[in-house]
Amino acid sequence: MKIDYYEALGVTRTADDKTLKAAFRKLAMQYHPDRNPDDPEAERKFKEIGEAYETLKDPQKRAAYDRFGHAAFENGGMGGGFGNGFGGAGGFADIFEDIFGEMMGGGRRRSNGGRERGADLRYNMEVTLEEAYAGKTAQIRVPTSITCDECSGSGAKPGSQPTTCTMCSGSGRVRAAQGFFSVERTCPGCNGRGQIIKDPCEKCHGQGRVTQERSLSVNIPTGIEDGTRIRLAGEGEAGLRGGPAGDLYIFLSVKPHEFFQRDGADLYCKVPISMTTAALGGQFEVSTLDGTQTRVKVPEGTQNGKQFRLKGKGMPVLRQSVTGDLYIQIDIETPQNLSKRQRELLEEFEKLSSQENSPKSAGFFSRMKEFFEGIGE
């Protein structure tokens, strides 16, 4: 019984090319013979989805199939130009390599003498808020793999050279028959390197790199925030057998500050003042990150939580000529451990107080009582 190509791929008859390709890719991953050895059913399904995609990916074949079904390709249908299955130049082998190549280790890629790019490295660094404000140049030591100086990264013992793998002729890939088509696989003779090192370097054991701690200078720009990432190109792990080095990524975090809290480019500082300063007015000085002392005037009658804005005294914005502000929040401290005389004076002050002195608290409780009595009626 002939299969329905759309059902085989699990798509509707209106599926576009992108949907067809995605469906084929997913099913090919699922039923590929390499993942299902000695499984005839998986092999059958794999052939079916390949046949279905081979037909539906071609606009002419798809139009013929939609109109005539499988009869379009039988007995010389459509002028005999399509044939049955995956015949013709390229065929399913090309489809498989283009769409599914990475599963087989890169499809049509060719080895570059076994050279491999080194891995990217991550380095976590903490900085103070002051350092984030002003920027700095930091020296760090990073344990990493560097190019072996004994063999200059070739992996071969000095005086010798790697030889080209005869199994893959230096490509690092070999073709293997898979039913009615062939696919590329990593060469088992050289593990994809394209070269064979018969006499490996004693220092790096044929890897072309050794582990060593390096000292690097890192420029920390002004205005960095938690999670800011700095990339040092080529400062990561050395490549294998002369391959390019990876990159080093510096991930920055800013330590909590004793006095300032940060919100983007703005800073916040809670300053305690006495009750009398809040009532009578006064002034105080705060230290800012630019190294200056800034005077803050407190008007009489200042309430708890009042904020004063110091423009331009916050954090610089990374890579911009913009600076945030510093907000001073007043925290009025209630007197404790009063002496007898202090208590007497406060009691006298309370007797002399009027509604004008405390407009918020005056009448608050009576209004609250009236409110809840009204609800109960």
Swiss-Prot record:
**SUPFAM superfamilies tied to this protein:** Chaperone J-domain (SSF46565), DnaJ/Hsp40 cysteine-rich domain (SSF57938), HSP40/DnaJ peptide-binding domain (SSF49493)
Show me the CXXCXGXG motif repeat boundaries.
148-155, 165-172, 187-194, 201-208
- From the Swiss-Prot or TrEMBL record, state where the protein is found: Cytoplasm
Looking up Pfam families in the UniProt record yields: DnaJ, DnaJ_C, DnaJ_CXXCXGXG
Keyword Repeat recorded:
yes
Listed cofactors:
Zn(2+)
Q: Could you tell me the keywords of this UniProt record?
A: Chaperone, Cytoplasm, DNA replication, Metal-binding, Repeat, Stress response, Zinc, Zinc-finger
Q: For binding Zn(2+) 2, which residues are annotated in this chain's numbering?
A: 165, 168, 187, 190
Chief location of this protein within or outside the cell: cytoplasm
Q: Where are the zinc fingers (CR-type)?
A: 135-213
**Presence of the UniProt keyword NAD in the record:** no
Q: Which GO terms describe its molecular function?
A: ATP binding; heat shock protein binding; unfolded protein binding; zinc ion binding
A cellular component term from Gene Ontology for this protein is: cytoplasm
The record's Gene Ontology biological-process terms are: chaperone cofactor-dependent protein refolding; DNA replication; protein refolding; response to heat
Query: Which free-text remark accompanies the cofactor?
Result: Binds 2 Zn(2+) ions per monomer.
* Source species, domain of life: Bacteria
| Residue ranges annotated for the J domain, each copy included | 4-69
Q: Where, in this chain's numbering, is Zn(2+) 1 bound? A: 148, 151, 201, 204
What does the annotation say about its assembly with partners? Homodimer.
Comment text on domains: The J domain is necessary and sufficient to stimulate DnaK ATPase activity. Zinc center 1 plays an important role in the autonomous, DnaK-independent chaperone activity of DnaJ. Zinc center 2 is essential for interaction with DnaK and for DnaJ activity.
Record family assignment: Belongs to the DnaJ family.
The name of this protein is: Chaperone protein DnaJ
